[in-house]
UniProtKB/Swiss-Prot annotation:
Sequence similarity: Belongs to the elongation factor P family.
InterPro entries: Elong-fact-P_C, NA-bd_OB-fold, Rib_uL2_dom2, Transl_elong_fac_P/YeiP, Transl_elong_KOW-like, Transl_elong_p-like_YeiP, Transl_elong_P/YeiP_cen, Transl_elong_P/YeiP_CS
SUPFAM superfamilies: Nucleic acid-binding proteins (SSF50249), Translation proteins SH3-like domain (SSF50104)
GO CC aspect terms: cytoplasm
A GO MF label: translation elongation factor activity
Gene3D superfamilies, per the entry: 2.30.30.30, Nucleic acid-binding proteins (2.40.50.140)
Lineage: Bacteria, Pseudomonadati, Pseudomonadota, Gammaproteobacteria, Oceanospirillales
Protein name, entry field: Elongation factor P-like protein
Amino acid sequence: MPKASEIKKNIAISYDNKTYIVKDIERSVPQGRAGGSLYRMRMYDVVTGRKLDETFKDSDMIDLADLVRRQVMFSYSDGDEFVFMDNEDYTPYSLNKSAIEEEILFVNEETVGIQVVLVNEVPVVIELPTNVELEVIETDPSIKGASATSRNKPAKLSTGAVIQVPEHISTGDRIKVNVEERKFAGRAEK
């Protein structure tokens, strides 16, 4: 059983005899309080989708839920439903946009390393690799000699996400994006 301080986003936990997916974690250190940090977790019930905000001490032990991860690839979207195909047995897994709205900003048909998380055979969330490769579809023109400066500019990616990139990046370039930090991580290898 991990401590509250070891829990990460998109982890499935058991709490009050229910299974929740942790979607957001805020760490705070109360002033004048001997002891550790507090972790406020925003969780969603995997069955009902209801939101629960709960605060844990850093030393609180938390039960992890039984879950299965399957390697998948993005197949298609149908309205607010996004369908992912299992890489081994081609089982389709359908997820609602509200369950994966942050992650879907970094997913297209070419994204590799996606995992769907199943709780009781039901898909509840997707997990992305640390870095994904996406194409810049719109940004200000690159400036000659800009690699010497460290200024950034906004760039719209092929998935619709907007991140800050160095000035030497231009429209049409393929770049690596750190999904967790939503930051430019370098040029993609050709």
